[in-house]
Amino acid sequence: MDTMGRHVISELWGCDFDKLNDIEFIEKTFVDAALKSGAEIREVAFHKFAPQGVSGVVIISESHLTIHTFPEHGYASIDVYTCGHLDPTIAADYIADKLGAQTRETIELPRGMRPIEVKKAQAL
């Protein structure tokens, strides 16, 4: 089935506190992930919260990559949504690896076609 896009949603657990709380590290990781997947970057916006946590988005021509971190729990939620022929798992795998996730639960949603079919991807 052809779709307009693929949306990978990952729950990352057991990540390093310092990495999850480092806005520069998170931003570089997301920019690198987008480029590794072959995406064209349009905008980048990240915010550091007090006392901890980072949220951000990389807008790509093909859609977006987002993150919300909770360093105090060793947890990050990430979304990688791509349209066209880009594979969002390339970016999602790279991000999980860079954050050192000990546990990862992922689902993939085909977007733009009905009905919605949730595909459970993988758990580390």
Curated annotation (Swiss-Prot):
Protein name, UniProt field: S-adenosylmethionine decarboxylase proenzyme
Modified residues (Pyruvic acid (Ser)): S63
CC terms in the record's Gene Ontology section: cytosol
Gene of this entry: speH
Cofactor-binding details, from the entry: Binds 1 pyruvoyl group covalently per subunit.
Enzyme active site: S63 (schiff-base intermediate with substrate), H68 (proton acceptor), C83 (proton donor)
Oligomer and partners: Heterotetramer of two alpha and two beta chains arranged as a dimer of alpha/beta heterodimers.
Family to which this protein belongs: Belongs to the prokaryotic AdoMetDC family. Type 1 subfamily.
GO biological process: spermidine biosynthetic process
Cofactor(s) this protein cannot do without: pyruvate
Site (Cleavage (non-hydrolytic)): residue numbering on this chain: E62, S63
Pathway: Amine and polyamine biosynthesis; S-adenosylmethioninamine biosynthesis; S-adenosylmethioninamine from S-adenosyl-L-methionine: step 1/1
A molecular-function term among this protein's GO annotations: adenosylmethionine decarboxylase activity
This protein's UniProt keywords: Autocatalytic cleavage, Decarboxylase, Lyase, Polyamine biosynthesis, Pyruvate, S-adenosyl-L-methionine, Schiff base, Spermidine biosynthesis, Zymogen
Record EC number: 4.1.1.50
InterPro entries the record matches: AdoMetDC_C, AdoMetDC_fam_prok, AdoMetDC_N, S-AdoMet_deCO2ase_core, S-AdoMet_deCOase_pro-enz
Species this protein is from: Geobacillus sp. (strain WCH70)
Protein function: Catalyzes the decarboxylation of S-adenosylmethionine to S-adenosylmethioninamine (dcAdoMet), the propylamine donor required for the synthesis of the polyamines spermine and spermidine from the diamine putrescine.
Highest taxon of source: Bacteria
Post-translational modification: Is synthesized initially as an inactive proenzyme. Formation of the active enzyme involves a self-maturation process in which the active site pyruvoyl group is generated from an internal serine residue via an autocatalytic post-translational modification. Two non-identical subunits are generated from the proenzyme in this reaction, and the pyruvate is formed at the N-terminus of the alpha chain, which is derived from the carboxyl end of the proenzyme.
Keyword rRNA-binding: no
Catalysed reactions, as listed in the record: S-adenosyl-L-methionine + H(+) = S-adenosyl 3-(methylsulfanyl)propylamine + CO2
Gene3D superfamilies: 3.30.160.750, S-adenosylmethionine decarboxylase domain
